[in-house]
C-alpha cells in the first residue's frame, strides 16, 4: 500500500519577499501558532483549521519556476509558527536544499524542547539561517504579551549558539511595552552573549493588521 504523502497547512505564499532574510525570498506562511501576541499582524494564521493543504513538492515546484530570482536569496518559512509543523517543515527544507535553494526559518522558538531535540536537530541540518523573534526579555511581561513564558525561547537561543547556527535576532518595538529602558538594556546585555548572532533587526510596531482583527471579530 502506498504511503500517504506528507502535507502541511499553508496560509499563503509570497514570491518576492525582501524583509525575511538575505536577498529575495520565497516566503511560506505556515498556518497555526500557539502564541497570541498582542501586536500580532497575522491573527488569521493562528488556528490550524485555516489555510490550504500543500505538499513540499508543490511548493518547491513553484520556487523552481523562477529560481533565478532567488539566486542571492532563498526560501523563508514564517507564519504563524512553522515549527508547529516540524515534520513537514523539515521535508520542505530538505527538498529545497536538494534543489540548491538556501533556507531560513523565522520562529519564536516557543516550541523548542531542550530535553528532546531530535526533530530540531534534523531541521537545523537543513536550515541555513534562523530569524529568532525575541518578544520580551522579562518573563512576566512576556506572558502578558504572548500568553507564554519565554523560557523555551532562550533555551532555543542557547541551543542555536551551541550548534553554531547563524541567527538574526528580531525584536518588535512597541512603545510602552517593549521599548522601555530596562528591557532594552537587558536585551543588549543578552545579545552580547550570542556568539552566533549575525544581525539584530529592530522592527517598528504598525497597525496594518487591524483590518484582520476586525474581519475575524477579534477584540
Residue ranges of predicted features:
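Conserved AdoMet/S-adenosylmethionine-binding subsite of the radical SAM
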Residues: 64-74, 83-208
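Short glycine/proline- and charge-enriched loop/turn segments
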Residues: 43, 214-219
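Residues at secondary-structure transition points
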Residues: 19, 24, 49-50, 54, ...
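Class I S-adenosyl-L-methionine
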Residues: 207-215
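N-terminal [4Fe-4S]-dependent radical SAM core
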Residues: 1-30, 34-52, 65-71
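Short acidic donor-binding/metal-coordinating loop in glycosyltransferase active sites
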Residues: 79-80
Amino acid at each position: 500500500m502506498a504511503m500517504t504523502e506528507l502535507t502541511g497547512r499553508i496560509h499563503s505564499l509570497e514570491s518576492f519577499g525582501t524583509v525575511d532574510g538575505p536577498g529575495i525570498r520565497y516566503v511560506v506562511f505556515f498556518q497555526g501558532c500557539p502564541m497570541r501576541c498582542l501586536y500580532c499582524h497575522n491573527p488569521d494564521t493562528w488556528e490550524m483549521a485555516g489555510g490550504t493543504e500543500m505538499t513540499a513538492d508543490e511548493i518547491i515546484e513553484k520556487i523552481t519556476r523562477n529560481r533565478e530570482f532567488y539566486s542571492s536569496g532563498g526560501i523563508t518559512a514564517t507564519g504563524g509558527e512553522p515549527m508547529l509543523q516540524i515534520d513537514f517543515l523539515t521535508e520542505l527544507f530538505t527538498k529545497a536544499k536538494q534543489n540548491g535553494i538556501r533556507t531560513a526559518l523565522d520562529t519564536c522558538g516557543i516550541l523548542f524542547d531542550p530535553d528532546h531535540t531530535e526533530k530540531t536537530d534534523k531541521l537545523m541540518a537543513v536550515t541555513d539561517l534562523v530569524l529568532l523573534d525575541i518578544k520580551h526579555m522579562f518573563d512576566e511581561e512576556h506572558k502578558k504579551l504572548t500568553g507564554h513564558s519565554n523560557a523555551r525561547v532562550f533555551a532555543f537561543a542557547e541551543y542555536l549558539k551551541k550548534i553554531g547556527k547563524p541567527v538574526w535576532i528580531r525584536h518588535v518595538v512597541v512603545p510602552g511595552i517593549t521599548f522601555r529602558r530596562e528591557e532594552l538594556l537587558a536585551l543588549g546585555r543578552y545579545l552580547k552573549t550570542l556568539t552566533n548572532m549575525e544581525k539584530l533587526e529592530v522592527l517598528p510596531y504598525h497597525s496594518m493588521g487591524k483590518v484582520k482583527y476586525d474581519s475575524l471579530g477579534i477584540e
